[in-house]
């Protein structure tokens, strides 16, 4: 998915003419489309697509069709899954770059890549785990200028007392980033459940937070 990368791509000075966001989870795609309305970015000259590849018989064929048959200049792979890496390779266009962002924990992890395209179509691959210092400074400047909004990545908030349990159960908790406030005592709470939490816990703080989220 990569909502941080998406907001970055859509709001920099040099922006793509097309962005295709894929996922297997329809709820995540629906949330992403709500945060980044297709029609809004169409007015800015960006063709934005949200595609659930899990519902497609032939994801590669459909993604290539969306690209106009040319493939993609840049493909970001966020899952260390062999089938996803192969799919990423298969949809690269000429001189396309596959950015393997998902760091695998298995030292023997490997996947198939089309080396015919490496030779004849100049496709290539790189691995990243984040930006360098200059990139971080740039992202902070863009955030301060309100051109990008890192908050789109956050789906839950909690206090320091929720950090340990959240960390241990992270794979089981749906949604995106979990934001922990180190100076507060607060159970981990989904942003879309803040108003409900205000009623159940009889705590106006959650209602105030819900108002901020809804604003």
Model-derived segments and spans:
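Short beta-alpha connecting loops at secondary-structure transitions
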Residues: 100, 120-127, 150-151
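Residues forming the Rossmann-fold NAD(P)(H) cofactor-binding site
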Residues: 3
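Glycine-centered, small-residue-biased loops immediately flanking beta-strands
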Residues: 17, 96-97
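Rossmann-fold NAD(P)-binding glycine/threonine-rich loop
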Residues: 82-86, 90, 102-122, 134-138
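Adenosine-nucleotide cofactor-binding segment
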Residues: 6, 10-84
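C-terminal hydrophobic helical "lid"/dimerization subdomain
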Residues: 34, 39, 57-61, 86-90, ...
């Amino acid at each position: 998915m990569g909502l941080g990368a998406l907001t970055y791509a859509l709001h920099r000075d040099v922006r793509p003419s097309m962005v295709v966001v894929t996922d297997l989870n329809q709820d995540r795609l629906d949330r992403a489309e709500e945060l980044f309305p297709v029609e809004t970015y169409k007015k800015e000259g960006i063709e934005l697509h949200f595609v659930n590849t899990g519902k497609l018989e032939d994801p590669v064929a459909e993604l290539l069709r969306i690209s106009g048959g040319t493939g993609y200049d840049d493909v970001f792979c966020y899952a260390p899954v062999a089938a996803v890496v192969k799919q990423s390779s298969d949809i690269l266009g000429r001189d396309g770059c596959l950015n393997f962002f998902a760091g695998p924990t298995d030292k023997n992890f490997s996947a198939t890549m089309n080396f015919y395209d490496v030779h004849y179509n100049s496709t290539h691959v790189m691995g990243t785990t984040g930006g360098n210092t200059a990139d971080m400074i740039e992202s902070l400047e863009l955030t301060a200028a309100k051109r990008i909004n890192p908050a789109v990545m956050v789906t839950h908030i909690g206090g320091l007392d929720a950090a340990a349990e959240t960390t241990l159960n992270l794979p089981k908790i749906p949604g995106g980033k979990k934001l922990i406030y180190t100076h507060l005592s607060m159970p981990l709470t989904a942003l879309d459940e803040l108003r409900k939490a205000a009623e159940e816990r009889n705590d106006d703080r959650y209602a105030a937070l819900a108002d901020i989220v809804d604003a």
